Amino acid sequence: MKPVWQKYIEIINQVVKPALGCTEPIAAAYGAAVAVQELGCSVPDSLEVFVSDNLYKNSMGVFVPGTGKIGLAIAAASGAIGGNADAGLEVLAAITPEQVLQAQEMIDAGKVSVKRTVTDEFIYCCVIAKFEGRESLVKICGGHTLIVEKQLNGKINFIADESSATSTGSICEGVDINIASIYEFATQVELEKIAFILQAADLNTKLSDEGMTNSYGLEVGRTMKKSIDEGILSNDLLNKIVMETAAASDARMGGATLPAMSNLGSGNQGIAATIPVVIAAKHYKNSDEQLARALILSHLGAIYIKSHYPPLSAFCGNTVTSAAAAMAMVYLAGGSFEQSCFAIQNVISDSSGMVCDGAKASCAMKVSTSSCAAVRAFLMAMNSRSVSGQGIIAKDVEQTIINIGQMISHGMPSTDTTIINIMSA
């Protein structure tokens, strides 16, 4: 096995992992759980939560799993009272109704405050917990569970080494990686080295089934199913992919108590990287090995493309995640590497203008839009049709990825500020 392939496996294991609930409010829940653990109490006297603008934006409209409620305050209070500080992104997996009630009582009593803070970091959350005159501080920065500092009664007892950072940009820094090397790795590495990725199919399919069975959010998936049953839509590959991908997002954003296999801290993007690939594999009757290789293509491809821009921004990351999924679908359909590159080009050309205006129920619509673009792009690619040398789409896929990264990093910060100001008005 090539030495760099082991690094690829490490990257995937590091940032493709189960997450219960939207990861921005979950970061606050996790920080609060750790802060209370440091204090050694069960219910703190008070909580103060300071977050970056982007983390604030992505927590304003999304349900916190197990609570039936929205926002950072309930996330932090629930994490403090019923969170498992050792469970990372699944910190609220065992939350009980009684603990949620206690959390709400804390909020109603004015014991939980949430404030935006000025920081250059996109992912930033600082939680201060107080109990009987003692105080703990936990600072998360650069990743949703990346604790960079802990204090107890004003004394620093932990500071992370700079090398521990796992933010989007740093995850691929210094690694010899590109679309061609990802394709070679995914299609040639020994199966036993990557079979673990099949857990993504299991977790995200269960979430999709939940969204199809029960009512969550806007019911994008269930609405499509109703239209299929009524003969308005056909039950074809395109609509199956869009329907089942959207259903998983419905459930996730609606507070379902099932984890998603996330991708670089995003459950929706983990869903977008997984469900279209799973449905395509069923359609083409691919083997489990082919599915595993396709999921590696999709997840690692998405990680690589997203390494070119900030982890949270005004750009909806489901677009480029779906580009990676389209590449994987080409592989499942027996297409070539060149056609896989065509698929990426086509998706980015199609839907790269979609903005992120916070995590919420309507994210399921954006997930459905992106997955639809992925199928369309994949079908065009299989017919060797590709956008090339137009707009931000270069003739070379690697340059296109650089271009989209530049557009987001340099062209969209003011858009992000405007969106946050509108949402906060």
Curated annotation (Swiss-Prot):
GO molecular function: L-cysteine desulfhydrase activity
Xref: InterPro entries: Ser_deHydtase-like_asu, UPF0597
Any one GO BP annotation for this protein: L-cysteine catabolic process to pyruvate
Source organism, top-level taxon: Bacteria
Family according to the record: Belongs to the UPF0597 family.
PANTHER family membership: UPF0597 PROTEIN YHAM
Record-linked HAMAP family: UPF0597
Record's protein name: UPF0597 protein Swoo_4889
Organism listed in the record: Shewanella woodyi (strain ATCC 51908 / MS32)
Lineage, highest ranks first: Bacteria, Pseudomonadati, Pseudomonadota, Gammaproteobacteria, Alteromonadales
